Amino acid sequence: MEITVSEIQVESKDETRSAEVRPQDERQEEKASMLCFKRRKKAAKAMKPKASSKAADAAKKCPPEARASDQPQRPGGAWDSIKRLVTRRKRSESSKQQKPFKAKLQSEINAEDANPSKKKAKSRLKIPCIKFSKGEKRSNHSKIIEDSDRSVKVQEAENLVTKTQTQSDDQATKSKSPQDVREDVSQKGDDEVCESNVNNSITSPGEKVISVELELDMGHSAIQRGTLILEKDTEMLEEKQSIQPQHVSPLEASDTEQELPVGSEVPPSSAVPDQQILEEARNGVLESGPDWKEHESREIVVEESKPKDTELSQELDFQENEITAEKPKPEESKRMEPIAIIITDTEISEFDVKKSKNVPKPFLISIENEQVGVFANDSGFEGRTSEQYETLLIETASSLVKNAIQLSIEQLVNEMASDDNTINNRLQ
């Protein structure tokens, strides 16, 4: 088990080295001739105290680059093993030579620190500093490019703001309040863009670049908020213009916008849902059951016939009571307290309907048209109507009795609950 673990560890190390070598080779291809200089003077860079962290990283990265250049050029065979021995000896000799060279460089660096006037004459030691300053300039250049991209986005946002302003001016030239809001937003956006341009002029050090980026982000977000506000204003104006021509002429609409821009929005919006509610109520009435249709047809026929007998008037009243009693919901039935009175009306009307035979012919014909569609003798009409009345009476009476029982049970339960609450409160 130990042998396998050691083998796995070795393989992982090789893999990590190869993974480190590949991005460095890519960097070599990008920087090309600059790296040759760095390889020759890596010892000088590594020992300098004033060199930046980037210099140290580059100096550390140089030896694996050399290894990477050697590794892919190794073919197999005994000749290669001899070459490797020779290259190892050369490396050991070069490392021995580098040690006194490093000591010399340290003495020279200390002398330069003591005499800063001599730095100008020694151009060899300035080369790596120049290289690293070039690298910093490149990073600043990339940041400046990013800033320029963001400034382009800010300019595009400004163009969108101006376009929305022109569209809104064309749509509603006389609306004042939304235009004032837009002018304020556009002024804020211009101020923020000016600040970002001023800060773009100072982008040489890294800290100022970061501050410029933050300010650009804030300006961009503020301009986005402004565009959102402008889009909302345009939507409100479009809704106004779509609703007002239905009710008011264009001249009157412009006058009302000048006087009461907020009040002109409310009445059409409140009128539309009222119309929808009325239409829904009408549809609900039309979609109700056949009993309601029978009731409407009966009422129309009765208005045309206008009977003079008191018994017929009682029957019609009873029919109305039946239909209104069948429709109420449980909430409405709870509110209807005089349920017993309705039951007494049904009993009286049952007695009247059974004994009454003075029913007009058009009244019976209307019922027959809705249900059968075939005309028959008067005796058939009378028999069928009496049966229908009986069934309606039984259904209504049963529904009313059920509602009354439910209400009584609920009242008892509520009373018991209230009594329990009072007892608990007293005990507490």
UniProtKB/Swiss-Prot annotation:
Report quaternary structure and partners.
Binding protein for dimer of the RII-beta regulatory subunit of cAMP-dependent protein kinase (PKA) and also for the protein kinase C (PKC) and the phosphatase calcineurin (PP2B). Each enzyme is inhibited when bound to the anchoring protein. Also binds the beta2-adrenergic receptor. Part of a complex containing AKAP5, ADCY5, ADCY6 and PDE4C. Interacts with ADCY8, and enhances its phosphorylation at lipid rafts. Interacts with ORAI1 (isoform alpha) (via N-terminus) upon store depletion and in response to LTC4. Does not interact with ORAI2 and ORAI3 paralogs.
| Protein purpose | Multivalent scaffold protein that anchors the cAMP-dependent protein kinase/PKA to cytoskeletal and/or organelle-associated proteins, targeting the signal carried by cAMP to specific intracellular effectors. Association with the beta2-adrenergic receptor (beta2-AR) not only regulates beta2-AR signaling pathway, but also the activation by PKA by switching off the beta2-AR signaling cascade.
In this chain, the stretch annotated as Essential to the intracellular anchoring function covers 1-170
Where is the PTM Phosphoserine found along the chain? S92, S94
Specify residue ranges for compositional bias: Polar residues.
Answer: 161-170
Q: Where is this region: RII-beta subunit binding domain?
A: 389-410
- At the top level, the lineage of the source is Eukaryota
- Lipidated positions (S-palmitoyl cysteine) are C36, C129
Name of the protein this chain belongs to: A-kinase anchor protein 5
What is the reported tissue distribution? Predominantly in brain, and to a lesser extent in adrenal medulla, lung and anterior pituitary.
A Pfam family cross-referenced in the UniProt record is WSK
Please report the record's description of how this protein sits within the membrane: Lipid-anchor
Residues found modified as Phosphothreonine: T87
User: Which InterPro entries does this chain map to?
Assistant: AKAP5, AKAP_WSK
One GO cellular-component annotation of the UniProt record comes to: excitatory synapse
**Species of the source:** Bos taurus
- Compartment(s) of residence: Postsynaptic recycling endosome membrane
Domain notes per entry: RII-alpha binding site, predicted to form an amphipathic helix, could participate in protein-protein interactions with a complementary surface on the R-subunit dimer. The N-terminal region, which is highly basic, is required for interaction with calmodulin.
